[in-house]
Regions:
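A conserved short coil-to-beta-strand element within the FAD-binding core of flavoproteins
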Residues: 127-135
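Beta1/beta-strand and adjacent pyrophosphate-binding region of the FAD-binding site
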Residues: 2-16
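Short alpha-helical segment within the catalytic ATP-binding CA
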Residues: 18-19, 51
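Short hydrophobic core segments
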Residues: 9-11, 105, 131
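Glycine-rich FAD pyrophosphate-binding loop
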Residues: 11, 25-45
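Active-site-adjacent segment of FAD-dependent monooxygenases/related oxidoreductases
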Residues: 43-118, 126
């Protein structure tokens, strides 16, 4: 592999790494994203996304591609082991222009962010690449 010089090295192509790489690239900050796995993970670990995260997706210019893949404005009922409700979450406001609770498929979000990173920003993303040390 040739030597690469960058301002920021991001280790991990999960949602956080992909968001960070996109945001830095949107401000013309050179970054390289590495991931030890062969691709993004195809099984969801996160299932809910809030309004402020949707604003970040909006700032990256891909909100319209993402909104049709989510279920908006859902609530939750929390039930104790003995079957009694102990909490109800039913958000109703759209303080930042989006509903506060939305369900999504994490692999869809990761695919969208990765495609945006590669096509819009022409960023360097390396899979099957492990971070070994820093000195």
């Amino acid at each position: 592999m040739k030597n690469l010089f960058t301002d920021v090295l991001i280790v991990g192509a999960g949602p956080t790494g992909l968001f960070l790489s996109n945001i830095l690239a949107s401000f013309n900050i050179k970054n390289v994203l590495i991931e030890k796995n062969k691709s993004t993970v195809k099984e969801p670990r996160a299932v809910s996304i809030d309004d402020e995260s949707l604003r970040v997706i909006q700032s990256l210019g891909v909100i319209n591609k993402f909104l049709n893949k989510i279920s908006i404005n859902y609530g939750s009922y929390y039930i104790s082991p003995n079957g009694k409700n102990f909490a109800v979450i039913e958000p109703t406001s759209k303080t930042y222009g989006f509903h506060k609770r939305n369900s999504f498929d994490q692999p869809d979000l990761e695919d969208l962010l990765l495609k945006n990173l590669i096509t819009k920003y022409k960023s360097n993303v390396f899979f099957n690449t492990e971070f070994l040390n820093f000195s």
